[in-house]
Amino acid sequence: MLYSKPKQLVVINIYCDRILSIFPNGTLKLVNYSKLKDGAYAAKLMEGVSPNVPMRSGVLGVFAIVLEFCAYAALAAYAYQKAPLYGAILFAGTTFACIVSSAYHLKCGLAEYMFLKYGRDERAKGMMLDLMGSGASLRLCSLGMITFYITLMVAIITGAIGFPIWALVFTILPIFIVMFPLQIVGTLHIAAMVSMLGWMFLI
């Protein structure tokens, strides 16, 4: 059985992603992410934000990712009953994605915390950018999710796990394509959470 509170799961994930990018003076989007290198832009954008906000996002985000793992592991277990190979790949993909994305989410929250805590000046900006630039391998968290969904799509198309072909609508790709023009930070993660609502009706 999938996690029984999918709406709460989606809300927690979206909330944790969005409070890292929505500020009183504007919203950080993918298209202007590189502007964070400009200390004046970052300081103005995050003016008035408490350091507790990114830390709250970090802690709640990891909690949400744990719930996410439970949901996707349940989907992998269901697939394993029908096709063990596909199920094993799905489980490996979601395990890798959730473990690495937990570390990545905490790192992003800590980077913003340091910038806000130490005065939003050039030194604080340098500390933030150094931290965000470190541990580049953590960005591979999306690799696990991509592996998961490619495997799931193949399993659906081949009929190996018994889902109808229209179940492809609930995979992450259609939702990601719809959301991408919005340039929301955390689009892949949010799309993955929204897709989980669909699987509640199929399992």
Functional labels for PLM-detected ranges:
Residues 1-203:
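Hydrophobic, aromatic-enriched alpha-helical segments typical of multi-pass transmembrane helices
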